[in-house]
Amino acid sequence: RIFDTSCKGFYDRGLFAQLDRVCEDCYNLYRKPHVAAECRRDCYTTEVFESCLKDLMMHDFINEYKEMALMVS
């Protein structure tokens, strides 16, 4: 799963892979399918996506990932 059709912005396979990896890792942390789905919802722009970044101890990269999400959304 690399490309989300709800994303209407700039298509970059590398960006999608990085964003999707956060959601995959978050799913692996909690093992609840709704976590991955909510993380990806609205093209990675939900609070769940940001919470996943925090839960994965990626505090230093939150702004960078939010910018990536805006580029593809």
UniProtKB/Swiss-Prot annotation:
For the modification Serine amide, the affected residues are S73
User: According to its UniProt record, which protein family does this protein belong to?
Assistant: Belongs to the arthropod CHH/MIH/GIH/VIH hormone family.
The Gene Ontology biological process annotation of the record reads: circadian rhythm; glucose metabolic process; neuropeptide signaling pathway
Provide the disulphide bond pattern.
C7-C43, C23-C39, C26-C52
Question: What is its subcellular localisation?
Answer: Secreted
One GO CC term, this protein: extracellular region
GO molecular function terms noted in the UniProt entry: neuropeptide hormone activity
Q: Which UniProt keywords apply?
A: Amidation, Carbohydrate metabolism, Disulfide bond, Glucose metabolism, Hormone, Neuropeptide, Secreted
Q: What is this protein called?
A: Crustacean hyperglycemic hormone
Report, as the record phrases it, the tissue specificity of this protein: Produced by the medulla terminalis X-organ in the eyestalks and transported to the sinus gland where they are stored and released. Found also in the brain; in the neuroendocrine structures of the protocerebrum.
Q: Which InterPro entries match?
A: Crust_neurhormone_CS, Crust_neurohorm, Crust_neurohorm_sf, Hyperglycemic, Hyperglycemic1
Quote the function comment for this protein: Hormone found in the sinus gland of isopods and decapods which controls the blood sugar level. Has a secretagogue action over the amylase released from the midgut gland. May act as a stress hormone and may be involved in the control of molting and reproduction.
